């Protein structure tokens, strides 16, 4: 299998004397992987994904990717946990999804038919095409997460990074998102941060525990025990 992403002893902190947020992390992500990263709040999970995206640069260590700097914005899709928007601004669902195509726009900045087709295809994938003309701010929390997934999919990425996509949403939308991701994994590599072990552990072919350092875990029992031990300080 193709190695799409390689991290070699990657470390990151803010400033010269700040605490290490990511501490000597090494891992490989192969094409077709569905990787879960779990761990306590403040464990560096989101920072690690920002390093993978190139939004932050490691203080030491190296990150290698099979995607060039030019095509990385299209090849790697990013679904954040939080999306800042002004509820008073009447942006539609389709306009929100189209914003995921910004990196494809020519210098004059107009969306083409190809962009509109890609946006509608992405909305169809997340089963929200009928809402394309609805106001984004009027959607439920679960629907908003599916729109953000569609926004990432509109660029037709080969690699998808998600930060807590099933957090704080209703069970129905949780299941829809997980089913969509399972279907996408047939042709897209996925790396997902999650706290929801009960619903998501069975989706992954590989799982890592992240608390400054990254540890590969073998099975769901190991996952649960390690998570409880590090999060609550109580090991069975």
Swiss-Prot record:
Protein localization: Cell inner membrane
Entries under PANTHER family matching the protein: METAL TRANSPORT SYSTEM ATP-BINDING PROTEIN TM_0124-RELATED (PTHR42734:SF17)
Main location group: membrane
Name listed for the protein in its UniProt record: Probable metal transport system ATP-binding protein TC_0697
Annotated ranges, domain ABC transporter: 5-236
Matches recorded under Pfam families: ABC_tran
Listed GO CC annotations: plasma membrane
Keyword Transcription: no
Function field: Part of an ATP-driven transport system TC_0696/TC_0697/TC_0698 for a metal. Probably responsible for energy coupling to the transport system.
Record-listed ATP binding positions: 39-46
Similarity field: Belongs to the ABC transporter superfamily.
Membrane topology: Peripheral membrane protein
GO molecular function: ATP binding; ATP hydrolysis activity
Species per Swiss-Prot/TrEMBL record: Chlamydia muridarum (strain MoPn / Nigg)
Keywords linked to the UniProt accession: ATP-binding, Cell inner membrane, Cell membrane, Membrane, Nucleotide-binding, Transport
